[in-house]
C-alpha cells in the first residue's frame, strides 16, 4: 500500500456571481461558488477536495482573479485539474490559472492585495452590462461616496 500524497494548487478564479448565494458553502443555500467547484471536482474524479478562498463574496457578487487553494489527496497534475474543470464547470465560473504550491501557501494570508469595484450607472445601462452594476436614477453626490 502506497503513502497517500497530499497536493496543493493555487487557483485564480473568475466568476459571475449573479446566480449564486456567495462564495462559501451555507446550510440553507444550495448554489455557491465553492460548492460548485467542489461538487464538479468530485464528479470528475470521484473524490472530495478541500478549497479555501482568499475572500468570501456575498450573494450576487462577481470576482475577477479570486485566489483559492485546492487540497487533493492523490497524485494529479495542474493540467489534469484544468482540463476537468474547464470541461465540467458552468460557463459563469472559469479557472484562469492553476499552479502547484507548497502546503505553506495560504490564499488568505498570502494574497497581496484585494480590490473592490462598485459600478453605479446614472443612466439606464445596456442590458449586456446591467447585471454588473447598480442603476441609480437620481442625482448622484460623488463626494458622499468617497
Regions found by a protein language model. Name each.
Residues 2-146:
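Structured-RNA-binding interfaces characteristic of tRNA pseudouridine synthases
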Amino acid at each position: 500500500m502506497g503513502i497517500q500524497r497530499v497536493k496543493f494548487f493555487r487557483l485564480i478564479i473568475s466568476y459571475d456571481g449573479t446566480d449564486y448565494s456567495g462564495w462559501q458553502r451555507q446550510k440553507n443555500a444550495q448554489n455557491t461558488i465553492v460548492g460548485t467547484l467542489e461538487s464538479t471536482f468530485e464528479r470528475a474524479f470521484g473524490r472530495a477536495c478541500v478549497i479555501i478562498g482568499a475572500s468570501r463574496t456575498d450573494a450576487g457578487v462577481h470576482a475577477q482573479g479570486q485566489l483559492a487553494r485546492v487540497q487533493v489527496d492523490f497524485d494529479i497534475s495542474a493540467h489534469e485539474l484544468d482540463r476537468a474543470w474547464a470541461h465540467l464547470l458552468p460557463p459563469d465560473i472559469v479557472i484562469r490559472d492553476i499552479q502547484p504550491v507548497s502546503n505553506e501557501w495560504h490564499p488568505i494570508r498570502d494574497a497581496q492585495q484585494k480590490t473592490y469595484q462598485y459600478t453605479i450607472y446614472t443612466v439606464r445601462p445596456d442590458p449586456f452590462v446591467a447585471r454588473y452594476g447598480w442603476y441609480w436614477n437620481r442625482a448622484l453626490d460623488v463626494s458622499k461616496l468617497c
